[in-house]
Amino acid sequence: MAEFPSKVSTRTSSPAQGAEASVSALRPDLGFVRSRLGALMLLQLVLGLLVWALIADTPYHLYPAYGWVMFVAVFLWLVTIVLFNLYLFQLHMKLYMVPWPLVLMIFNISATVLYITAFIACSAAVDLTSLRGTRPYNQRAAASFFACLVMIAYGVSAFFSYQAWRGVGSNAATSQMAGGYA
């Protein structure tokens, strides 16, 4: 029968040390911001903010078309913020069971289609809802322009998301080194 050792080395830790380790693991990946996906998401956030800020500064609640534009712009802006933070802090790697390339492709295609409808609604309603040369007219026209730009940005993201989903132009080594968002 083996004897029980007289000396046992133990190591204790406090709960604060464990919490500190999980907070330090949540560091931003600045390589993501320099990637195509990160740059396009930042562009979508800036342009989307311009769209809904310009519309929100007019009496949009009087016209249903602008209610739709506001819904699309704010909803997609918020979802893009969530996705941007998931990728910035590499939280998508912790949720490995989610097929992120497929999720991004579906989101970007849906966002493109929604922004197409918002752009058409916004630009078609400019002349009908305000007098040419007035401040609301200029804001709504500018919102139409930025809605077109953000629609193009989501379209480009949809194209790159489709390529990432299909695995076009990458191999296992480069996609691992680039963190999956080359």
From Swiss-Prot:
Q: Which domain of life is it from?
A: Eukaryota
User: Topology versus the membrane, per the UniProt entry?
Assistant: Multi-pass membrane protein
* The UniProt record lists the keyword Transferase: no
Topological domains on the Cytoplasmic side lie at 1-35, 90-99, 163-182
Give start and end of each MARVEL domain.
32-166
Give the free-text PTM comment from the record.
Phosphorylated.
* Function (record text): Main component of the myelin sheath that plays an important role in myelin membrane biogenesis and myelination. Plays an essential function in apical endocytosis. Regulates epithelial development through the regulation of apical endocytosis. Part of the intracellular machinery that mediates basolateral-to-apical transport of ICAM-1, an essential adhesion receptor in epithelial cells, from the subapical compartment in hepatic epithelial cells.
Which family does the entry's similarity section mention?
A: Belongs to the MAL family.
State the oligomer form and interacting partners: Forms oligomers.
What name does UniProt use for this protein? Answer: Plasmolipin
Organism ancestry: Eukaryota, Metazoa, Chordata, Craniata, Vertebrata
Give the gene symbol.
Answer: PLLP
